[in-house]
């Protein structure tokens, strides 16, 4: 599609970035929602969630470089959209953690606080700019190491 055709659907470049960012965030949330409803232990769902988010970020960055760049621009311009996305993910994670507490898998903590801490501890796996800078570094924890560390922090 030519640039002229694109602007028949979008009023500006900013609108293109916003739409792309919303689409990526929607895909991220949908993946998280599907994982949250799997009939697995809370630990396994958290593991799949974190590694899935990382994989989605890496695949976008490597396979769709232009999309990755547009998402980064949208993140910088529309942080309020990212805040809403983080809150939705935190709520989803809190539900998984609550189920893990009820099953005796995790320590008895505030699920909302635990979800925020879990998500924050794994930001290097899903923030596009951080992933881009750290992907090939050998002196960083691997995604598996980070996820296992974060899950162990929730256990009794």
Q: What residue spans do the PLM features occupy?
A:
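Helix-turn-helix
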Residues: 1-15, 19
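Feature detects amphipathic, helix-rich regulatory segments
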Residues: 6, 18-21, 67, 71-72
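Alpha-helical structural segments
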Residues: 15-37, 44, 48-55, 59, ...
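Helix-loop "lid/cap" segments that line or gate small-molecule binding pockets
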Residues: 35-36, 51-58, 68-73, 150-154
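A conserved beta-strand->loop->alpha-helix hinge within the catalytic CA
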Residues: 41-45, 110-113
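Amphipathic C-terminal alpha-helical segment
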Residues: 55-59, 90, 95, 99, ...
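Hydrophobic/aromatic-rich alpha-helical bundle segments in the mid-to-C-terminal region
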Residues: 65-72, 79, 83, 101-147
């Amino acid at each position: 599609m030519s640039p002229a055709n694109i602007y028949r659907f979008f009023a500006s470049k900013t609108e293109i970035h916003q739409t792309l960012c919303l689409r990526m965030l929607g895909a991220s949330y949908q993946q998280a929602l599907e994982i949250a409803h799997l009939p697995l232990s809370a630990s396994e769902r958290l593991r799949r969630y974190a590694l899935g988010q990382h994989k989605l970020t890496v695949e976008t960055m490597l396979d769709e470089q232009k999309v990755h760049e547009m998402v980064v621009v949208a993140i910088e311009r529309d942080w309020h959209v990212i805040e809403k996305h983080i809150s939705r993910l935190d709520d989803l994670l809190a539900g998984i953690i609550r189920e893990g507490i009820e099953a005796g898998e995790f320590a008895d903590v505030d699920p909302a606080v635990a979800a925020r801490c879990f998500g924050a501890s794994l930001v290097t796996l899903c923030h596009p700019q951080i992933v881009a800078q750290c992907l090939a570094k050998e002196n960083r924890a691997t995604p598996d190491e980070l996820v296992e560390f974060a899950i162990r922090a929730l256990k009794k």
